[in-house]
């Protein structure tokens, strides 16, 4: 029987329970994934502590992960058992050995990318894609300012913006973070 982290009440890390859970079969449009890695994000803490309310209790935390497809539901044609996938922006359930997720939330993992990297990139990467392409399409010659340039989203955003040809100004809270930001795409860093 697979295991999962379950939360029955809001609180600190002590409210998380590691439990046996039934192996769920994927429904229409869903896939089941044998987890290789998960991303741990502040949003998981917000839900666990009750800062954001879960739509149901108990629940399994987690919004992104990566692994191998073990089963596909009706109508799923883009994946088959054995495919390596990463996924993000699911309602919850990633802190599990074999979660069932919407196939539409998954993407194939390219050769040369390991599951740990893929799992850690999904929510942060989707956030950056949204900001640098949909909110404002960054183009060569633009100058952008990125707050918290050495944070998880900031490190991806600064590299991506630099790749797009922008001049990147980042902010950081320490000399060490400023150096990290410079190593990851910032042309200039403001210490605060």
Where are the model-predicted features located?
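Conserved beta-strand elements of the Class I
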Residues: 5, 31-32, 145
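Generic hydrophobic/aromatic pocket-lining and core-packing "Φ" positions
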Residues: 84, 157-158, 178
């Amino acid at each position: 029987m697979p295991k999962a982290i379950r939360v029955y009440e809001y609180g600190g890390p002590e409210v998380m329970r590691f439990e046996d859970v039934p192996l769920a079969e994927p429904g229409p449009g869903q896939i089941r994934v044998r987890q290789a890695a998960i991303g741990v994000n502040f949003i998981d803490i917000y839900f666990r502590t009750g800062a954001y309310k879960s739509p149901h209790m108990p629940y399994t935390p987690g919004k992104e992960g990566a692994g191998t497809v073990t089963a596909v539901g009706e109508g799923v044609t883009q994946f088959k058992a054995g495919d390596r996938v990463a996924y993000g922006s699911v309602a919850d359930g990633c802190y599990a050995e074999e979660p069932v997720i919407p196939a539409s939330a998954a993407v194939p993992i390219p050769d040369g990318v390991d599951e740990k990297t893929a799992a850690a990139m999904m929510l942060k990467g989707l956030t950056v894609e949204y900001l640098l392409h949909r909110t404002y399409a960054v183009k060569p010659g633009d100058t952008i300012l990125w707050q918290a340039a050495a944070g998880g989203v900031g490190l991806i955003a600064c590299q991506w913006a630099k790749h797009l040809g922008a001049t990147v100004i980042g902010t950081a809270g320490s000399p060490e973070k400023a150096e990290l930001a410079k190593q990851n795409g910032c042309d200039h860093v403001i210490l605060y």
